[in-house]
């Protein structure tokens, strides 16, 4: 049985911001579970028995060579992809990189990474990234 297809899956996401206010995005690769070729806030699946923050830390370490601090829950959203027959529940967290420089360690899952100014993001974003971005921009506007 497959997570997100045969039953609802849980996938965590990380919004990471550098000291210039740029957002870290990754382009989904050919082996991604869905929305291949689109840019996203990186993340991954939660394994059975794994806490959300631990899953996010593991995914950032495995896929990008990063150690992160999970700071705050931004959003929990339904990530429903009718064309792909998938449904994920997606908690997304605002995080900070504590060590490492981002690199692509699993090229099948990710083909490109980059830091983007919030006003100059790629237009081809995943569904959940668009939703998370809207909530993040509202959060920083309120906090400013």
Pin down the residues of each PLM region:
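A generic structural micro-feature
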Residues: 4-8, 35-38, 83-89, 107-110
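Conserved small/polar residues in nucleotide/adenosyl-binding loops
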Residues: 141-142
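Active-site-adjacent beta-strand/loop module that shapes the phosphate/pyrophosphate-binding cleft
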Residues: 18, 78-102, 136
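Conserved N-terminal beta-strand and adjoining loop/helix that marks the start
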Residues: 1-23, 76, 94
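Conserved Nudix-box catalytic region and its N-terminal flanking loop in Nudix hydrolases
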Residues: 22-62
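Conserved beta-strand segments that form the floor/walls of ligand-binding pockets within enzyme
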Residues: 40, 92-94, 114
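NUDIX/MutT-family hydrolases
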Residues: 104-136
């Amino acid at each position: 049985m497959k997570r997100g297809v045969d039953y609802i899956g849980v996938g965590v996401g990380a919004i990471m911001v550098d000291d210039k206010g740029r957002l870290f995005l990754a382009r989904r690769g050919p082996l991604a579970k869905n929305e291949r070729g689109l840019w996203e806030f990186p993340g991954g699946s939660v394994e059975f028995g794994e806490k959300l923050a631990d899953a996010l830390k593991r995914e950032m370490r495995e896929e990008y060579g990063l150690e992160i601090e999970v700071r705050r829950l931004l959003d929990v959203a339904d990530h429903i992809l009718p064309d792909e027959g998938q449904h994920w529940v997606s908690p997304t967290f605002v995080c900070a990189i504590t060590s490492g420089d981002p690199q692509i360690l699993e090229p099948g899952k990710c083909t490109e990474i980059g830091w983007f100014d919030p006003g100059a993001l790629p237009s081809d974003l995943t569904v959940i990234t668009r939703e998370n971005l809207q909530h993040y921009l509202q959060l920083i506007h309120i906090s400013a």
